Each structure stands twice: as structure tokens, then as C-alpha cells.
């Protein structure tokens, strides 16, 4: 497929590489031009603007940081809403608010374009290995049309509904669950350490028995080692996603006390000098509260 791709950070860069490997034709754009230029030797076209990347594209992928960045690309100076051809599909693969997902769906329909929300679960190493999990919502016809793209980037695609905002909600709710696991692990390892038990042995028990999922293995390993480098998902992005799930919960009148707790943990981590760390560093708050 002819694909426009905007957002070549750690995740987007790996995803774009895999699309090229799979034989798709890419036109790329990144706010920091040097990241885009890295793709020129691979056969990609480097666009001057997001709108240029979307012009003539069958599919246009956004993998940027937040709602503001997506809005800038689609409605602002990027002007993708004007340049994506009728019949083209915008695939938003980043984590955005449910409200923005609704707005994008309506705006693209108004231009006779299509919109799919397809946020991903996985860190940069999973993106590089094409092992992402992709939650997709939108029209069945467009999802089928875009499946080769998803296959190039991920190990499994989950269709969660025919209304694009459903995937955005699944993503922010899934990220909420990850943060609750991180918080629980932080508390558990604080108890283990203060009681003199080997954190590595505790991790072995967890991941070798009932807690063998990637979330427990990845974050349990980081917390057991008290090592949060390299940063795979930063604290500011974690705080952004926490705000998104709390906003969705407020809209639906659903209390989420754990989300509020995690929000305070992230604020505490930021106040204590961990604002640039991986979001898993909230586990250090439990250590400090335990006097460790």
C-alpha cells in the first residue's frame, strides 16, 4: 500500500521500518527532520509537511505523542484533513482521548475519508520485533483493507468494535491496568526488600508461576533490579494516559480510585526528580515510603 506516516519516535520509527520491510511504499514526516531523513536510504520519500505525506496516500498513519499533536497534524498546520484523498483512511495508532477519536471520526466522514483507531500495546523493543498487539476499531471493510499493515507491525490484531472510539477506550483502559500492576509490584517488592528476601528470587516465583505475562516479566524485572533505563515509556506520557482514562471515567460516571492513586504516585515521582524516568519508576515511591 501507499502509506503516509507521521511520528518517527522510538515506536513510530520501528513501525515504519517494518512497513518498509513488508514492501509498503512510505512517505514519512517527523517534526525533527533528521529522524525522517534516516528513511530516505531505505526507499521512503521524505515529506516537507504532514499534508504532503498524506497527499495521494491510501492509508495515513499517525504515531505521535498526544491529542494536541494529532490535532496539529490533522486540523492544524499539517492540514491532513484537506490533503488525504477521498476514500483514504487515517489510522491513528497512538493513544488519544475518546473525545478526540469521536471528533476525528466525524471530521473524516465529512471529507468522505475513513478513520480507524488502532492503538498498540508494547514497548519499543516489541515494535522493533513486529510483536505489537494492536487494538482496532472501525468499519470491517477498512480493517480488512488495512490488515496487511497491521500484520507487518504486530503479532496479533484484536478487533474491538466497529466504532473507532472503542479502540481508544480499550487502549487507555489497558494502560490503566498496566499502571496498577506497576504500583502493586512496587509495593510488593518494597516489602520483599525490607524483609531481607532476594528480589530476584521473588521475581522468579512470580514469573514462573501465576504471573508470567509480559507486563509482570518486563516491569517486575525493572523493579527487581531497581533499573529504569532505557526509558521505554516516559513519566509524562504515563501521566497523559492517566488523565485520559480519568476523563473517560468521569464522562461515564465510573469511579476509578486506583487511577486516582496512580495519578498521585506519578505526581510524587515527578516532584522527587523522576519526571524524565520510565513510568515504572513510580515503584521507587514505595521504596522511599518504606525507608529504603
Give the ranges of each region predicted by the language model:
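Hydrophobic residues within alpha-helices
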Residues: 15-16, 35, 104, 149, ...
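Hydrophobic beta-strand scaffold residues
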Residues: 26, 46, 115-116, 157, ...
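Rossmann-fold dinucleotide-binding core
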Residues: 95-176
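Rossmann-fold NAD(P) dinucleotide-binding segment
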Residues: 50-114
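Helical "substrate-binding/catalytic lid" subdomain
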Residues: 164-290
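NAD(P)+-binding Rossmann beta1-loop-alpha1 motif at the extreme N-terminus of oxidoreductases
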Residues: 1-63, 88, 93, 124, ...
Amino acid at each position: 500500500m501507499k502509506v503516509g506516516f507521521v511520528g518517527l519516535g522510538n515506536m513510530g520509527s520501528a513501525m515504519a521500518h517494518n512497513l518498509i520491510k513488508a514492501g509498503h511504499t512510505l512517505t514519512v514526516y517527523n517534526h525533527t527532520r533528521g529522524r525522517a531523513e534516516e528513511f530516505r536510504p531505505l526507499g521512503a520519500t521524505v515529506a516537507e509537511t504532514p499534508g504532503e505525506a498524506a497527499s495521494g496516500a491510501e492509508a495515513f498513519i499517525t504515531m505521535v505523542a498526544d491529542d494536541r499533536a494529532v490535532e496539529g497534524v490533522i486540523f492544524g498546520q499539517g492540514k491532513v484533513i484537506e490533503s488525504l484523498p477521498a476514500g483514504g483512511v487515517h489510522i491513528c495508532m497512538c493513544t488519544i482521548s475518546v473525545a478526540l477519536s469521536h471528533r476525528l471520526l466525524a471530521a473524516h466522514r465529512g471529507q468522505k475519508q475513513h478513520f480507524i483507531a488502532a492503538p498498540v500495546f508494547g514497548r519499543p523493543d516489541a515494535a522493533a520485533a513486529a510483536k505489537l498487539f494492536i487494538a482496532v476499531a472501525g468499519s470491517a471493510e477498512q480493517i480488512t483493507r488495512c490488515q496487511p499493515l497491521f500484520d507487518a507491525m504486530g503479532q496479533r490484531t484484536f478487533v474491538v468494535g466497529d466504532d473507532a472510539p472503542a479502540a481508544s477506550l480499550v487502549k487507555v483502559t489497558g494502560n490503566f491496568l498496566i499502571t496498577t500492576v506497576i504500583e502493586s509490584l512496587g509495593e510488593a517488592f518494597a516489602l520483599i526488600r525490607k524483609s531481607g528476601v532476594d528480589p530476584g528470587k521473588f521475581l522468579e516465583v512470580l514469573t514462573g508461576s501465576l504471573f508470567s505475562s509480559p507486563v509482570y516479566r518486563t516491569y517486575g524485572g525493572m523493579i527487581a533490579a531497581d533499573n529504569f533505563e532505557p526509558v521505554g515509556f516516559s513519566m509524562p506520557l504515563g501521566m497523559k494516559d492517566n488523565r485520559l482514562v480519568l476523563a473517560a471515567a468521569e464522562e461515564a460516571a465510573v469511579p476509578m480510585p486506583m487511577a486516582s492513586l496512580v495519578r498521585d504516585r506519578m505526581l510524587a515521582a515527578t516532584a522527587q526528580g523522576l519526571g524524565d524516568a520510565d513510568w515504572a519508576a513510580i515503584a521507587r515511591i514505595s521504596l522511599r515510603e518504606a525507608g529504603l
